[in-house]
Amino acid sequence: MEKISNLLEDKPVVIFSKTSCCMSHSIKSLISGYGANSTVYELDEMSNGPEIERALVELGCKPTVPAVFIGQELVGGANQLMSLQVRNQLASLLRRAGAIWI
């Protein structure tokens, strides 16, 4: 968890992704559509990507990508983010984390 905690520090939105994952692309587009400037870690482009992926599994992320943290809290993957969007709760979560101001 410490490896992930260090990557989350002082960042309102963090997305763990893989460049070949279409769901990761969809979630990145969804969040950027709100104007949120998220930090994206592409695990398949990182030397320690497999290690971070194992840490995400330990946190309960299955599948491991996309894994979204808002306000340093694990929100979940694509299903959880889409559910928040459908229930009109994603914007308020981003606002509380300081990722957007409207």
UniProtKB/Swiss-Prot annotation:
Pfam families: Glutaredoxin. Keywords: 2Fe-2S, Cytoplasm, Iron, Iron-sulfur, Metal-binding, Redox-active center. One of its GO terms (molecular function) is 2 iron, 2 sulfur cluster binding. Residues 1-101 form the Glutaredoxin domain. Its main location: cytoplasm. [2Fe-2S] cluster binds at C21. InterPro entries: GlrX-like_pln_2, Glutaredoxin, Glutaredoxin_subgr, Thioredoxin-like_sf. It is found in: Cytoplasm. GO terms for biological process: response to nitrate. The keyword Methyltransferase does not apply. The keyword Phosphoprotein does not apply. GO terms for cellular component: cytoplasm. PANTHER family: GLUTAREDOXIN (PTHR10168). Belongs to the glutaredoxin family. CC-type subfamily. May only reduce GSH-thiol disulfides, but not protein disulfides. NCBIfam families: GlrX-like_plant. This is Monothiol glutaredoxin-S1. It comes from Arabidopsis thaliana (Mouse-ear cress). The gene is GRXS1.
